[in-house]
């Protein structure tokens, strides 16, 4: 039986990913802060699954919780690190920004590092990290969020190089979504994609063991433009 852990499974991309992976026969370890949401989701899915609460604000505790879940499941071939927080920063607020750094940087790093170490010990596996197209440009009204996602994408790129040097069958997939219709999105700007469509493309990238994927595919054009256009022009849009 294929087994996967989804960190950040209580809503949005993680929730839909659980639905689609379970339909493919995966036994899942569902992790998020809201235990009630995870339990409800596990009852909706075919088969038996594991539920474990986790809060990436406390990275040390989160590491223990991930390790415990892996032991409970016995063997895990796929770990998806999807947890992340974002907020509009009309006013610079340290409480908001420090939470984003704790979750999106420290928490993400802890989960990804431990997943990689586990896969090295196991002799192979697949780590999927959810970043954002926001990693490719700075946003004046969400500067910390953009900066944390730049870290995530860079970290995963480095992890991919490390996996290659290990000569083990370890795949690192970077997922960079654009606008996806999830609870995190405050409005619905142009090119907002239904979460079902977005996750279908993510699942395809997982199956094909892609190293990097934009979600949806049209966002590759935006990413390229942000590298080509001058900064003064980009600042008119972000």
Language-model segments: residues:
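Rossmann-fold cofactor-recognition segment
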Residues: 45-60
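Conserved glycine-rich Rossmann-like NAD(P)H-binding loop of the short-chain dehydrogenase/reductase
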Residues: 24-41
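Short alpha-helical oligomerization interface
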Residues: 89-102
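Residue(s) in the substrate-gating loop at a strand-loop-helix junction
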Residues: 132
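Conserved glycine-rich cofactor-binding loop
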Residues: 10-11
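C-terminal helical subdomain
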Residues: 174, 187-223
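Active-site helix of classical SDR
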Residues: 112, 148
């Amino acid at each position: 039986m294929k087994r996967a852990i989804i960190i950040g499974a209580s809503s949005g991309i993680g929730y839909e990913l659980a639905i689609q992976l379970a339909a493919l026969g995966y036994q899942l370890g569902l992790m998020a802060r809201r235990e009630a949401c995870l339990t409800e989701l596990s009852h909706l899915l075919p088969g038996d699954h594991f539920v474990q609460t986790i809060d990436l604000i406390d990275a040390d505790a989160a590491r223990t919780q991930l390790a415990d879940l892996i032991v409970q499941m016995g063997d895990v071939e796929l770990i998806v690190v999807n947890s992340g927080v974002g907020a509009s920063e009309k006013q610079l607020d340290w409480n908001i920004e420090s939470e984003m750094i704790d979750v999106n940087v420290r928490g993400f790093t802890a989960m990804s590092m431990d997943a990689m170490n586990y896969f090295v010990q196991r002799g192979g596996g697949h780590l999927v990290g959810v970043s954002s197209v926001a990693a490719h440009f700075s946003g004046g009204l969400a500067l910390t969020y953009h900066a944390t996602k730049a870290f995530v994408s860079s970290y995963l790129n480095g992890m991919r190089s490390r996996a290659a040097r290990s000569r083990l069958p370890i795949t690192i997939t970077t997922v960079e979504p654009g606008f996806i219709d999830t609870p995190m999105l405050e409005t619905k700007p142009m090119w907002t994609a239904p979460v079902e469509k977005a996750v279908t493309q993510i699942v395809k990238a997982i199956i094909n063991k892609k190293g990097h994927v934009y979600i949806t595919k049209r966002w590759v054009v935006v990413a390229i433009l942000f590298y080509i256009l001058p900064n003064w022009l980009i600042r008119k849009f972000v």
